[in-house]
């Protein structure tokens, strides 16, 4: 029975496209309460980092994050695997190593059979096993739409933690996955994505960002984040604002997934692309329609955005090659300039 079910038809959003826009989220997070300060909380939500980081002594820190969303693909196992991979990415993006995870499941038990939920959980468990950790438990509720994700605990040496606020002018910018996930998954939700492209985007979303843990010990690695629902420009703007730098991006060097261009021409643009653009358009130089479609595209389980000092570029390229990870040079960071946009796109 579950083989004929299209999960994407049971949700109004898809993957990280479910995220609230950066502009609206800023309003939600405002508070009139006095802020409780814990000196052991090394990273909170002030700099839009990927996870919280807490000092536990002896030079070590616990990394804590959660991420969940509605179906981005139709297959339950693949949905669970992608959602789990996406949640684990926050730990890797901070430079940490995951320790364990617990599942978060919302499920319309009156609309879908329990075996579908079982396959979703199984996909999540598989991704955790690939990352070398256990899915230790979780919590489930009856919901109107399927929702799945993880709360993940990780660990890292404090000196290896990569913050959005630690990037420096002169750093080169690299991406570890091509863009276009939001475009292809929008085509899938509309029933227009070819089978080869379904497999291509699924495999990309299921790739763990373990390279983050391997790169973290390099002192020349100044900042790192994963590209998810706010698109490349949104997550890059978070680094630029937190670190008081500006960026120049070569849009022709930004790799896109094979086939994305044809789906852009067909109008397979997620609604979140425009919401993203409106949230940070004032920070970015003017964009062409194509640049907006690609650079503001909502990624689910996207790659890492890496800022690295020039003298270590060869090192990170060697590490990427050793583990078979993609690595694309897309731009550079500079000192702020009053006559320049926060992000210049060429």
Curated annotation (Swiss-Prot):
It is an enzyme of class 2 (transferase). One of its GO terms (biological process) is selenocysteine biosynthetic process. The active site is at 16. Belongs to the selenophosphate synthase 1 family. Class I subfamily. SUPFAM superfamilies: PurM C-terminal domain-like (SSF56042), PurM N-terminal domain-like (SSF55326). Mg(2+) binds at residues 50, 90, 226. Binds 1 Mg(2+) ion per monomer. Homodimer. It catalyses: hydrogenselenide + ATP + H2O = selenophosphate + AMP + phosphate + 2 H(+). This is Selenide, water dikinase. One of its GO terms (cellular component) is cytoplasm. Its cofactor is Mg(2+). The record marks 19 as: Important for catalytic activity. The gene is selD. GO terms for molecular function: ATP binding; magnesium ion binding; selenide, water dikinase activity.
